[in-house]
């Protein structure tokens, strides 16, 4: 799963007062990877923590229970719309219809972390070793675990569950950047880094 519109800034862009989610396949989720711009329409780049669910997550689980049930990895998401000139012009309902504009998710080493380990942490995005932008985990509904809990509840409302073996790209620390060719790296405080090579 990927979760979008997890900050007030992104919700305002799409006139929404809540997040939304879409489903992703194993094909679109990769460990430290190389991508080609020719495989995408108008891709962006976002900095997100990826939760790998080890044990079923319930909507009423505590923060600590969710963290215990998941491994967390540094991640990069590549949103991509199927419409021309889609960002930020796509509407809220078009984003839903487009599977929350999923393109790809790349993640690094996954480990067990506590709630405090990923609370109020910084992420720094680099392109070709030059700093591009910084962001903070508080942009993700105050804490990324809140995003996972929101998803678990949203699934339960549909009669579904957030089950072991699933992954969750939990929401961006910063507004997205246009993806371009080069070598990207995101360094996350406490969580390590993830790299992505993008070919023209």
Where are these regions (language model features)?
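Catalytic-core "active-site belt" of small-molecule-metabolizing enzymes
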Residues: 1-142, 180, 193-200
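Conserved metal-binding segment of the jelly-roll/cupin
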Residues: 162-175, 179
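Short, structured beta-strand/loop micro-motifs enriched in basic residues and often containing a Trp
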Residues: 148-153, 166-168
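Active-site proximal loops enriched in glycine and acidic residues that flank catalytic Cys/His/Asp
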Residues: 171-172, 188, 198-200
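Extended mid-to-C-terminal alpha-helical interaction segments
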Residues: 155-159, 191
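A short tyrosine-centered beta-strand micro-motif
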Residues: 184-186
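Gly/Ser/Thr-rich active-site loops/lids in small-molecule metabolic enzymes
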Residues: 145
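Short strand-turn-strand beta-turns centered on an Asx-Gly dipeptide
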Residues: 127-129, 170, 189
């Amino acid at each position: 799963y990927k979760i979008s519109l997890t900050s007030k800034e992104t919700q305002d862009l799409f006139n929404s007062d809540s997040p939304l989610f879409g489903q992703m396949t194993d094909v679109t989720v990769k460990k430290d990877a190389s991508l080609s711009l020719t495989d995408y329409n108008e891709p962006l780049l976002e900095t997100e923590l990826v939760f790998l669910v080890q044990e079923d997550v319930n909507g009423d689980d505590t923060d600590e229970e969710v963290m215990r049930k998941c491994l967390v990895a540094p991640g990069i998401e590549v949103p991509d719309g199927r419409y021309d000139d889609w960002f930020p012009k796509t509407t809220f309902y078009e984003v839903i219809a487009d599977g929350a504009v999923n393109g790809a998710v790349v993640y690094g080493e996954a480990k067990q972390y506590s709630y405090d380990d990923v609370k109020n942490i910084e992420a720094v995005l680099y392109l070709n070793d030059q700093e591009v932008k910084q962001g903070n985990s508080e942009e993700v509904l105050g804490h990324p675990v809140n995003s996972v809990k929101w998803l678990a509840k949203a699934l339960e409302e549909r009669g579904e569950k957030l089950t072991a073996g699933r992954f969750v790209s939990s929401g961006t620390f910063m507004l997205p950047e246009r993806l371009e060719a080069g070598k990207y790296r995101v360094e996350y405080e406490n969580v390590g880094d993830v790299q992505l090579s993008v070919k023209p």
